[in-house]
Every structure is written in structure tokens, then in C-alpha cells.
């Protein structure tokens, strides 16, 4: 009765043995995968050989060490034949990264200097400043108001024109009123000429019309004396431009100034000198001669 049945202890033992076998297989696989990696290299013919993980498929489980030379590499189990791959210089393909080798960089790989970005940004900033300055200078030159060439060429002429008022072209109505005022002034001057003679004119106003100096005070600059009679008549305005029409006919009364006799000059600063006699003889009884005074 008991011989046909399996005890629970027997079944547990079988399960334990299966687990042990599975663990052994896993450990063997881990030991197989824990070997060294032989990096790729260039052989003597210049052909690139791809790297591999030790042990390979045809090697034994204990061949976990990369052995050989830099030009020929293989897997072995002898620690004395181990290859120092760090001293080889042909284990790097140009332009291709080698898996498992992060300690060495390719010959073509060059690090970018840290100052290059700052140099680029500074160059752009300086170029922007220069371009802005040029644009501002062009805008200021284009928008600047242009100076009148006549004003800049003849500043003295403008001052002369301000000093000497120009005679505008008179209209027909102004011409008729000026003719009436001139006739009235000439009649009044002829009426006053019988009673009193006009004062002697200087050479400067020799060409002025009759009644101009008697009725109107004209402020004439000194540089008008060099002008001839024709130019003087063109420059001096008509009397109707300075006086209103109701006051043109009135003449300015000129009073005669009596001549005062000139006393003889006497030099009293130095002693012993006689008084200076005038060049002409005086017949007036009011004049007296004073003797020289000695100090």
C-alpha cells in the first residue's frame, strides 16, 4: 500500500536537484561572458579586424584572457600571455568609435576651444555697432537741412541791404499821391524862399531833389559821398514814403544862427608867451586883448 506512493520528501529532493543544475548552468554562462574584450586592430596588411569578446565560440570556457600581439589577438587562459591593449596604437579605426573603449579618442576628433562661442558673439556685437554707426551717420547727413548758397555766399550784402532800404516798385495810386505831395512841397518851399534863403547844401546832397532836405531829415551814411548823382537819386527814397499825406506840405523852419565872434586864443600853460593872434583881423569893439600872465 505504501510502496505505490511517493513521499513528499522525495519530490522536494528532485526539485532541489533541478534548481542546482539550473544555477550551475547560469554560473557557467556568467563565467563565459565575464572574459576580456579584444579591441579591433589593423593587421600588417592594413585590414581592419573587428574586436570580439573572450571566450569566443570555438574557445574553451576558461579562455577569458585576450592574448597575442597588437597585430594579432586571440583568447587564452594563460595570464602570462595577456596582451596589454593600452600600449597598442593600431586599435582605433579612423572615424569609427570602438565599443567598449571610452578611454581613448580618435585621431580625427578635436575638441572645440571654449573661447570660440564667446569670440563669435563678440564679433557679431561689434559688427552690429559698426553697422548702426554707419546707418546713423548716413541718416543725419541726408536729413540735415540744406543751407541757402546765396545766404552763405554774401553775408556782407545782406547787412548792406538791411542798412540801405530798397525802393519798391510804386503802384499808380502811390505814384499819384507822391506827385501831389511833391507839388505841394515845391509850392511851400517856393513860398518860403522869398522870406528866407535855404541853407547851403554840402557836396553830398548836390543831386537831391528840391525840398527834400527842407522837409525830410534823411539819415544818409558816410559811404554815400562816393556815389555819383545818378546813383544817389536812385537810393534816396521819395519824401512821401516817410511822411503822411496831410503833413507833406509843411516845411521845416530853419532859424538863422548868429555868428559869435571868436576871442583870441591864449596859451597860459607856459610863462613868457604872448597870446595867439587869429589869422584875420577883428574890428569888433567888444573884443579885448589880454596881456600875458606870468606864473
Swiss-Prot record:
Cytoplasmic side: 132-295
Membrane topology: Single-pass type I membrane protein
Endpoints of the signal sequence: 1-33
Effect of a null allele: Mice exhibit no defects in head development. Mice are live-born. About one-third of the homozygous mutants were normal and fertile and about two-thirds were dwarf. Reduction in weight gain became apparent at the postnatal third week; about half of the dwarf mice subsequently resumed the weight increase, although they remained dwarf; the other died within a month after birth.
Keywords: Developmental protein, Endoplasmic reticulum, Membrane, Signal, Transmembrane, Transmembrane helix
Topological domain spans for side Extracellular: 34-110
Gene Ontology biological-process entries: negative regulation of fibroblast growth factor receptor signaling pathway; negative regulation of Wnt signaling pathway
Cell location: Endoplasmic reticulum membrane
Membership in a protein family: Belongs to the shisa family.
Protein name listed in UniProt: Protein shisa-2 homolog
